[in-house]
């Protein structure tokens, strides 16, 4: 499994019990779906909308907060795979809008961010299908419902 460095920057996350375990289990589930993954330490920032909005503007040139940002460390990072930043307010609103638990939505977005650190993307439909299939399998390992219930699961790499 990849090691996790969890940083809780926003007090809004204090109401979520078992954060460390949740984060580690999400990364572990993703790792089980990626036998050829790149090892290394993943830093996960549980932040607020304002901080993530600032990063989104600075690094992507986009205004406003987004749910998750991934920052791959690159080739010369000595065991640091990259960083994942998550915005509490955005994630909370999305979970409420979708009528799902905050913890389950967070698990999904951690797995999603980790896949970006592993080189996966979803710019093209075929890439999105592969990425979503891995997300579905990793979440199923955690007992989390399919986050894409109205979409065809599409093909994906098999872990067994």
Curated annotation (Swiss-Prot):
Cited SUPFAM superfamilies: Metalloproteases ('zincins'), catalytic domain (SSF55486)
Keyword Nuclease attributed: yes
Primary enzyme class: hydrolase
Cofactor(s) required, per the database record: Zn(2+)
Keywords annotated in UniProt: Cytoplasm, Endonuclease, Hydrolase, Metal-binding, Nuclease, Ribosome biogenesis, rRNA processing, Zinc
InterPro entries: MetalPrtase_cat_dom_sf_prd, YbeY, YbeY_CS
EC number: 3.1.-.-
GO molecular function per UniProt: metalloendopeptidase activity; RNA endonuclease activity; zinc ion binding
Single GO biological process annotation from the record: rRNA processing
rRNA processing recorded as keyword: yes
GO cellular-component term (any): cytoplasm
Cofactor note: Binds 1 zinc ion.
Cited function: Single strand-specific metallo-endoribonuclease involved in late-stage 70S ribosome quality control and in maturation of the 3' terminus of the 16S rRNA.
HAMAP family: Endoribonucl_YbeY
Protein name as catalogued: Endoribonuclease YbeY
UniProt organism field: Maricaulis maris (strain MCS10)
């Amino acid at each position: 499994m990849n090691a996790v460095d969890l940083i809780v920057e926003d007090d809004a996350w204090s109401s979520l019990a078992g954060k460390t375990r949740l984060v580690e289990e999400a990364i572990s589930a993703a790792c089980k779906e990626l036998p050829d993954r790149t090892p290394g330490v993943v830093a996960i920032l549980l932040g607020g909308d304002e901080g993530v909005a600032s990063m989104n503007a600075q690094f992507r040139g986009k205004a406003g907060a987004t749910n998750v940002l991934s920052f791959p460390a690159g080739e010369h990072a000595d065991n640091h795979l990259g960083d994942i930043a998550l915005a509490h307010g955005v994630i909370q609103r999305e979970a409420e809008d979708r009528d799902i638990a905050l913890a389950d939505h967070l698990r999904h977005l951690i797995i999603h961010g980790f896949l970006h650190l592993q080189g996966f993307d979803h710019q093209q439909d075929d890439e999105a299908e592969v990425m979503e299939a891995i997300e579905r399998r990793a979440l199923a390992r955690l007992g989390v419902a399919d986050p894409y219930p109205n979409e065809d699961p599409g093909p994906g790499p098999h872990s067994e």
